[in-house]
Design a protein with these regions (language model features):
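Catalytic adenosine-cofactor/nucleotide-binding cores of aminoacyl-tRNA synthetases and other
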Residues: 1-288
Length: 288
């Protein structure tokens, strides 16, 4: 369920729950545009909905399906680490930096950032990413083997250590070796820090749309702001409404209101995957 009534939206704006009529959690045209929805995706959604004389509901997932289908073949794939932890390659030359022969010629060095959930000290079964003794592929770069980690006084991992095999550059030199895990990364020296915003439905569907007093039952986690994300250098030039696929994460758009030259702010448009398969409207659990 999403909020479409003007009376409810006005109250959300007046109470400061959303930052305006174009807040990306809403479904006005201005809000969808700010979030990164394209005209083609909205047209596709309208065509799939069709016209019905009877009262009916439409899957909200269908709207996300349309934008995902429109963007997946159009937008460049970029490296972005949203929950970073440092990865130190102990046997890589300390001052050396190289440009890999991959998209955007991404810089590579001794210290990288990887996603925090790409390392576990005591992993469960079928976890194929970094853990002590395991080898993984750094996307577009080398194979690395985890040797350990550093922790702070609270027991939180502050850095992960590994060694690399120089013969495996860009996917070569590993005949006979099976590496199941591939993770993305950015170089610590060249990546820039940026804010990324993750959006969910503004209505808490598990508790119902309305409270007993008739007010909306709002989702307290409808907006998550990540201030310590590290992105590849090319994304620094992003302008308002520019959209990209962040590898293994989702599709993101530079915010038209808060982005500044050299300091973009990114809104998540939609995640990469969904189980949605164009069901009949009456079978949907989420309605628009």
């Amino acid at each position: 369920n999403v909020v479409t009534g003007k009376r409810y939206i006005k109250k959300l704006v007046m109470d400061g729950i959303v930052d305006g009529w174009d807040d990306p959690r809403l479904v006005s045209i201005a809000a969808l545009r700010r979030r990164g929805f394209t005209p083609e995706s909205i047209k596709m959604f309208v065509e799939l909905c069709g016209v019905s004389k009877a009262q009916s509901s439409v899957c909200y997932d269908m709207l996300e399906y349309c934008i995902r289908e429109d963007l997946k073949l159009k937008r460049p794939r970029m490296m972005a680490v949203l929950d970073p932890v440092k990865l130190i390659i102990d046997n890589y030359p300390e001052e050396q930096m190289e440009e890999l022969e991959i998209e955007n010629n991404l810089p590579f060095g001794r210290e990288l950032y990887i996603n925090r959930d790409d390392f576990m000290e005591n992993p469960p079964r079928k976890y194929f990413r970094l853990f002590p003794g395991n080898e993984v592929r750094l996307m577009g770069a080398y194979f690395v083997t985890c040797t350990g980690c550093e922790k702070d006084e609270a027991g939180n991992v502050t850095a992960v250590h590994c060694t690399y095999d120089p013969e495996t550059k860009c996917g070569s030199g590993f005949t006979g070796r099976k590496v199941k895990g591939t993770i993305h990364w950015v170089a610590a020296k060249t990546a820039f820090r940026a804010q990324v915003r993750l959006y969910e439905n503004i209505i808490d569907e598990e508790k119902g749309v309305y409270n007993e007093d008739g007010s909306l039952n709002l989702n307290p986690n409808s907006l998550t702001v990540l201030d310590d994300c590290y992105l590849e250098p090319a994304l620094k030039e992003a302008k308002a409404y520019d959209s990209y696929q962040f590898v293994r994460t989702g599709f993101f758009c530079a915010d038209c209101r808060d982005s500044k030259p050299g300091a973009p702010v990114f809104n998540r448009i939609v995640s990469l995957k969904s189980s949605f398969k164009l069901p009949k409207p009456e079978d949907c659990s989420k309605t628009l």
